[in-house]
Amino acid sequence: MRVALDTNRLTDLFQGDSELADRLGECDEVWLPLMVLAEIQAGFYGGSQQHRNELLLRSFLVKPTVGIMFPTRDTAEHYARLFIQLKRAGTPIPDNDLWIAALVLQHDLVLITRDRHFERVPQLLRDYSAR
């Protein structure tokens, strides 16, 4: 299985969600969209355990099945189509989440998240399993 992690689930993982850790260990590929990396690092800078959290992130990123996804021109096209789709439906989602959805669709991944607003993107494969 090929998955992408949303920020809330990466946070859960770093807070010791062993069920999620086990599930991710069974995945062939685990991707972090660049926006998730930025959001998680912003949280570190505002938190009281910055050093601990940065160590957790580094140890996660060196796993052979884990990678970072970067937007490309194709991602921008996916973003634009989704933006118009959601605007016409009157159901926008936050900008970073729109970028995340575009990357996940572009690479045909399953998004592991707790954010229900991703349901507004029906073509997006989602996994809402949570603690």
Question: Where are the regions that the model predicts?
Answer:
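Active-site neighborhoods of divalent-metal-dependent phosphate/nucleic-acid chemistry enzymes
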Residues: 67-112
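Short, well-structured N-terminal submotif of metal-dependent ribonuclease cores
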Residues: 1-36, 42-59
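Acidic, PIN/NYN-like endoribonuclease modules and their adjacent C-terminal/linker elements
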Residues: 101, 105-131
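Alpha-helix capping/helix-boundary segments
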Residues: 9-10, 75, 99-100, 117-118
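A general structural signal for well-ordered alpha-helical segments in protein cores
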Residues: 37, 53-57, 76-79, 97
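Short, hinge-like loop/turn segments at secondary-structure boundaries
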Residues: 47-51, 86-87, 128-131
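Generic structural signal for small/hydrophobic residues in well-ordered secondary structure
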Residues: 6-7, 40, 79, 104
